């Protein structure tokens, strides 16, 4: 049986979740996030910033590196290529090395599947060549 981890520390009273979420989202993306989907439905980005990046990423249960790596693994297993590309870039933006991500691809092959690992390797190679 897995050990239960610690509870998340609550955000300080008065924390502006939108401001916090915007800062977290920008750090992971490496730049401010914008684009047609957010212009078409701006509330989507508000929900992402306040809830996902503010409420969840802003807590201290997982650091950004672990959270991005877990997200990349989930996306590779779906497979969700466009989102995986974005989160592999996010892994680099939060400090994971290219070597760490190459090892991640090796783990994907043994734990998830060969085709998923090949997709991740192709995306990673493309990202690293940019």
Question: Which residue ranges define each predicted feature?
Answer:
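Short, structured motif recognition centered on aromatic/hydrophobic residues
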Residues: 66-76, 104-108
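Acidic, glycine/proline-rich low-complexity segments that act as flexible tails and inter-domain linkers
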Residues: 1-64, 93, 106-130
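Short loop/beta submotifs within extracellular cysteine-rich repeat domains
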Residues: 78-84, 113-114
């Amino acid at each position: 049986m897995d050990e239960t981890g610690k509870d998340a520390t609550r955000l300080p009273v008065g924390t502006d979740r939108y401001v916090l979420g915007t800062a977290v989202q920008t750090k992971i993306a490496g730049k401010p996030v914008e684009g047609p989907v957010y212009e078409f439905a701006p509330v989507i980005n508000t929900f992402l910033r306040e809830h996902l990046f503010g409420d969840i990423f802003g807590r201290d249960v997982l650091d950004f590196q672990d959270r991005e790596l877990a997200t990349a693994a989930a996306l590779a297993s779906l497979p969700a290529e466009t989102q995986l590309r974005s989160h592999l870039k996010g892994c680099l933006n939060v400090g994971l090395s290219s070597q760490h991500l190459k090892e991640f691809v090796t783990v994907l092959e043994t734990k998830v599947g060969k085709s998923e690992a090949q997709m991740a390797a192709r995306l990673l190679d493309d990202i690293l060549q940019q």
